[in-house]
Amino acid sequence: MAFKKPQITEVKTDIQSLSIYLRSVKKFGKTTLFRDLVLEKFGDPTKGLLVGCGAEMGYTILDNLNATQVEDWDDMEDLKDWLIEEKGKEHDIKMVAFDVVGELIPIAEEKIIRMSTKETGKVCKSFNSAFGGYGEPRKRLLKLLKEYFSALKKAGIMPFAISHTKVKSIKEKGDDTEGYNTLTSDLSNDCEGIFGDIFDCVLTGCIDREVKDGKVTTEVRKLYFRGNGYIDAGCRFANDAVPEYIVFDKPNMAKDFIKVLEDGLKKSRTNKITDEEFKEKQRKEVIELDKQVEQIRENKELSIETKTEIIDKVKANLSKIEIADLKAIMT
């Protein structure tokens, strides 16, 4: 990997440059929001892709949605290769949603089991015993997830992860109190940490209900962009660049959703610009995103060519080459 010279960073301007992790209670409207987001932003359903994961098929009664299904990790790898290799050829997908990422965990665990059998030469029958057990299976799992979504981001294809929520009891290390409750995702803490680290926006949807005499009198749907002690949420924006939450009360929330995030990007800039300048930067930014996938493809082709040259060199000198020299060539 070639050294990249340092350069001054600049805040992104377009929602296409954001990786988004959305958690909420079931039937909140997460999948519908992604569908509406694609249509509002691009006016074309083929610009987005909804990936149903494992047993989750939350898109079967939504129309105007570009969708596919993955059943195992090989499907995930094939999907990633297709997204990167065929962008600008078979497709022009800008955003990819994974619904729900909780279903990816058992899929990834099965992949780790197969990897263990292949790499160690010993039959592995359970995830916890993979690669000798202890903490190694979890390390491999987290690495697999992180590398997958990071690869998409590097290629300029921003992932949109969807998950369910769960109230968890949190107790900090060294804290003698009983801890506190927080509304976060239903993933294990280490997997949740991976998505929290990778994604730019960690959003949480919930429903506030007022109950009187054992009956719900009112309910308000809210989508949180910033946490409040109980709600776990946050974005990589400047302070107060986005509201704590928006009321999620319209049949189509896409326009409001896009405005909040793109306004947040604009407010996060240290040097203020006009709306016209902002739109021009958005236009250039989208072009640069498309160039990223081209660079990934070029790097991959160069890597393949280099390996081929090494193999040809070994074949040509196999009869006279020493083992020490062979190691030097391969490294």
Question: What spans do the regions from the language model cover?
Answer:
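Structured loop/turn residues at beta-strand edges in well-structured enzyme cores
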Residues: 91, 155, 197
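P-loop NTPase motor core
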Residues: 103-190
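Phosphate-binding/switch region of NTP-binding enzymes
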Residues: 159-240
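Eukaryote-biased recognition of electropositive, low-complexity segments
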Residues: 206-280
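Surface-exposed alpha-helical segments enriched in charged/polar residues
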Residues: 81-85, 146-150, 294
